Amino acid sequence: MTIHSPWETSHSKKGLIDIGTHRLFARVSGPRRKPGDPVILIECGGGSISLLWTGVMRALSPTYRIFTYSRAGLEGSDLPPNRGPRTAVEMADDFEKLLDVAGIKSPYIIVGHSYAGVQIRTWMHVHDRMEDIVGAVFVDTATEYTYPRMPIREPQFWFLMEQIPNPAHVLGYDRVHKFFNKEQWEEVLSTDLGHEEKDVDASAAQLKTWKQFERQIMEDKPVSVIKGYFAEDLRRLCVEAERIGAGTPAQRQYVMENLDSLDRVFEETETEQLRLSSCARMVHAAPGSGHTIVFSDPEIVMNEIKWVVEQYEAKRSIATIKGDLSNITAPPFLLASQSTCEFPSYWAEHPSIFVAPALEPDPKKRALLVLRWFLAALKRQQYAGRDEKEGVKKPLNAFLGELFFAQWQDQSGTTKLVSEQVSHHPPITACYLWNDEHGVRADGFACQSITFSGTVNIKQMGHAILHIDKYDEDYLIPLPNVKVQGLLTGTPYPELVGSYQIACSSGFVADIDFSGKKLFGMSGTKNMLHAALYSADDKQRENPIYTIEGAWNDKFTIRDESTGENVETYDTAANPATILEVAPLDLQDPWESRKAWGETISSLNGGKMQGASDAKSKVEQGQRAMRKQDEQNGSKWEPVFFSNEPRDERYIRLTAVAGTSTEEHSQSGFWKFDKDRAERARKPYHGSLRPDNVES
């Protein structure tokens, strides 16, 4: 992409652009683009101007390049040569000429508000821009079906705008916006919007003939639809109109009686936009935010723009990846803001469920409660504590010697965790989880092998052994394999795969089967599980004691097979995680996760991708230098809290109960919590040495 235009090279620019027949006022801001980087094109709503988007532009422009303009007759743009109502096709022609004259090259991410929903899709079709557009955000947009279905049209509510002295004040738009300083906001209030005439019905009718919803015109490109509340704006104006006597009682009553129907029309027609792409999602603005979301709920607009950019960038990266992912460094936008060293914490987020087996005298029910704990922890483990709608991201690769300490406090007392990265090749995380009040403890270790073949395949090696002091009872806890599906369609989600056993030293085995969403949806359902608890003597698995059916990311039901009754339906949404407690950063050791990755995490959370990349590289380069020094000196890294043993009798006994192989650990050995090492451990754990190989 060779760039010559000042509209592409200037960090910030505004002014009139002559498109031949008239001039249009435009704005651009943001860093210069590299080849393949998208520019965000903002098409304003009906009668709206580019100035109203400058707050969002200012907040996003440190990271993204953004171009917007005001259509003919608005904000200093010339009136069009042909006066009178204009169609979306005529406006699309103006936009196409504008991009050409300004030298704004693809790829484009298009953002439209309100009437711009009709406008930008007309431009896509008329000027054959589908290949150039890599994503879209529709901000409370109208479609070709909105206007014909609306129970209230402009002639029926326009009295509100004409007779109320300051409708912007009633709607709250004249309050200083968080992304504007006072001076900038005064410019917004003092600027003449201008005027444009639109032939809405003709434009909608034309768009309808192209049947874009039926053809999924954006294929698998990311599309976000943000639903606002236009009806709420009209309600507020009606209340004010009644207060000051604007309009007739009949006019006000008609509007008020049809507001619910109006909102349903917007909900239905905006939802239809999800059919434009197989990679589409819909989010709702904050209740009461009204129609002009760029003022009332700007964060949601910014977040959805970021989401679309991230999905596009992810596709660019994924297209170049094949084979083993273990040593591939993910780009920052794909990274989660926590390390793999933190992941054992998700086993402990429900302390009461973790210790519940210690309170149960019946061994069968104890085994069931251990199975319940295992299943209840899966959702937040697989999504790394993120909202399910946000999908999955790659965690930071823990460095050798990385440490993570945490605790949880609730009615069950205090549950604690220590985890440590004990090996680099292969990467192994060891952990120890315990609750002294109830005498429940678990230690384990995990090593992941990650490959890519359209889906990310994560094979987990390792296990945990849960011990209950009161009954001197052990349980072998498996680590399920994972496929991350949907990467190429932009909606990544984890799917557990395979069959596993939880073996109990008291003579019980739980069989667990994860049946994922099969190809083309012909069989199976996403995130489903089936589990059954048996006596270990029931070798043919003919007489289950308890069975469990459901979805590990939603609800699952436990059934007592002896009575045929459902014992419990566990709802993941109704059981929020207990708050995780960690030491303040200034009290953490340099080798603790959040201290060591502090700059990286801060940059990721702040959307500063370059800063995240630089901070991450600093740690990684320091680690490479340390490994090279170890190799030259013939030294071996020694963990602080764990030691490796060639044999674990507990594991051998429990695999015999389950009837599974012991070959998995023949090479790597068994990592176990070492009480002697733990008692000797003192801060600073590695003296003056830091993870970035710089002495403190």
UniProtKB/Swiss-Prot annotation:
Any idea what job this protein has?
Probable transporter; part of the gene cluster that mediates the biosynthesis of enfumafungin, a glycosylated fernene-type triterpenoid with potent antifungal activity, mediated by its interaction with beta-1,3-glucan synthase and the fungal cell wall. Might be involved in transport of enfumafungin to and across organelle membranes.
Annotated family? Belongs to the OSBP family.
Cross-referenced Pfam families: Abhydrolase_1 (PF00561), Oxysterol_BP (PF01237)
Concerning InterPro entries, the annotation shows: AB_hydrolase_1 (IPR000073), AB_hydrolase_fold (IPR029058), OSBP_sf (IPR037239), Oxysterol-bd (IPR000648), Oxysterol-bd_CS (IPR018494)
Transport in keyword set: yes
Q: Name one GO cellular component term.
A: cytosol
Entry protein name: Probable transporter efuK
Q: Do the record's keywords include Ribonucleoprotein? A: no
The organism's place on the tree of life at top rank: Eukaryota
Which species is this UniProt entry from? Hormonema carpetanum
PROSITE patterns hit by this protein: OSBP
Region labeled Disordered — which residues? Answer: 603-642
Feature: compositional bias, Basic and acidic residues: 615-633
Molecular function (Gene Ontology), one example = oxysterol binding
Query: What keywords are annotated for this sequence in UniProt?
Result: Transport
